């Protein structure tokens, strides 16, 4: 997508052919900073510290993390360590394990002399596949927005509500939930996005608002608790969110607060769609609430807030009393019954076991 008018990806191979460049998302929206990853441990830190985030991008970064490890040491022990270190960084996003399994399959059975080239080749393929998948999601979701636009008066906007950041910053390019939004905008459809701030990390405020602005998509930043009010007053036409894991039964694990948006959407007859790339499906899990591990993050993410001062300094200040007990769950699960449809690269399907297995039979069969 565009940054200051220049086509940009969220992850790339540096000109030296082996180190990996990423955008440091912790610096956005106030500074555009890139970071070079040169070791397995640097890649793991980037994932763990949310320098990069978003399920597809976590997978892509993990893939290159394996490649960096193999470059230093192509032994079986090095491969196993890379797998274990990266898998432990973020437990909820299934793309992480999917990408690591793909890398192991591509590298493990090769002679050591071939492993370096094979690892970098598969990591690059995973990145290109992500772009193709998300482009497919955009094409699948575009008719939904076109249908909503057809009911509007001339020049009246389709209003989309989204939660967290499922944009190109969460993927290699174009994003998942934003893919149909960007395509609609580029097709000249009047579209406007309500972006939840998404406490406590504020990905909606810091990332979604930034990237929508860079692409010229009209948008309004709202507090997390505003969505239900907007829906009650007919100001939201559709909710489109991303996901970090979808179960075989269609339950959706996404950023904390997504479940509340789905409940509000159901109560107000607003369609609730989930943009789902196929690597995010976990056919090994059926009940999302009972089986998906929910990451619990540091208390300071809730008890403090970071922003830019009037003098231009980036500072973190505490907003809760010292010693306050904090619960910081990173994700929640929206039951399949609340999901209008899953927007996949193979079309819009029901959030059900039959629909998922029908659309992706090879992946469903591999999980048995």
Please describe what each predicted stretch is.
Residues 2, 9-113:
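Long amphipathic alpha-helical segments
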Residues 36, 40-43, 55, 59, ...:
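Generic structural signal for well-ordered, non-membrane alpha-helical segments
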Residues 23, 61, 65, 97-99, ...:
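Short beta-strand segments
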């Amino acid at each position: 997508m565009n940054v200051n008018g220049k086509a940009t990806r969220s992850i790339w191979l540096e000109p030296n052919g082996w180190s990996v460049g990423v955008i440091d998302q912790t610096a956005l929206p106030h500074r555009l900073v890139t970071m070079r990853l040169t070791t397995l441990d640097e890649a793991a830190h980037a994932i763990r510290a949310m320098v990069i985030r978003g399920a597809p991008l976590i997978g892509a970064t993990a893939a290159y993390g394996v490649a960096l490890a193999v470059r230093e040491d192509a032994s079986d022990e090095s491969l196993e360590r890379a797998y274990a270190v990266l898998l432990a960084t973020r437990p909820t996003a299934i793309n992480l394990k999917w990408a690591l399994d793909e890398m192991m399959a591509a590298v493990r059975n090769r002679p050591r002399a071939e492993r370096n080239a094979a690892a970098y080749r598969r990591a690059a393929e995973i990145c290109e596949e992500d772009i193709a998948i998300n482009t497919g999601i955009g094409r699948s979701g575009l008719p939904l927005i076109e249908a909503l636009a057809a009911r509007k008066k001339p020049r009246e906007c389709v209003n989309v509500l989204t939660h967290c950041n499922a944009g190109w910053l969460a993927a290699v390019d174009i994003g998942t939930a934003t893919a149909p939004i960007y395509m609609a905008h580029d097709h000249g459809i009047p579209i406007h996005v309500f972006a939840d701030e998404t406490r406590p990390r504020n990905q909606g405020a810091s990332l979604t608002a930034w990237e929508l602005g860079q692409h010229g998509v009209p948008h309004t930043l709202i507090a997390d608790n505003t969505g239900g009010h907007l829906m009650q007053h007919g100001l939201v036409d559709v909710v489109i969110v991303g996901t970090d894991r979808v179960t075989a039964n269609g339950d959706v694990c996404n950023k904390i607060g997504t479940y509340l948006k789905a409940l509000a959407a159901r109560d107000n007859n607003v369609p609730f769609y989930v943009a789902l790339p196929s690597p995010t499906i976990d056919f090994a899990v059926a009940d999302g609430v009972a089986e998906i591990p929910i990451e619990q993050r540091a208390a300071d993410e809730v008890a403090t807030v970071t922003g830019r001062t009037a003098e231009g300094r980036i500072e973190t200040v505490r907003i809760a009393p010292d010693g306050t007990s904090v619960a910081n769950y990173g994700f929640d699960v929206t039951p399949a019954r609340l999901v209008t449809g899953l927007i996949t690269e193979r079309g819009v399907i029901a959030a059900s076991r039959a629909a998922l297995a029908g659309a992706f039979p090879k992946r469903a069969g591999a999980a048995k």
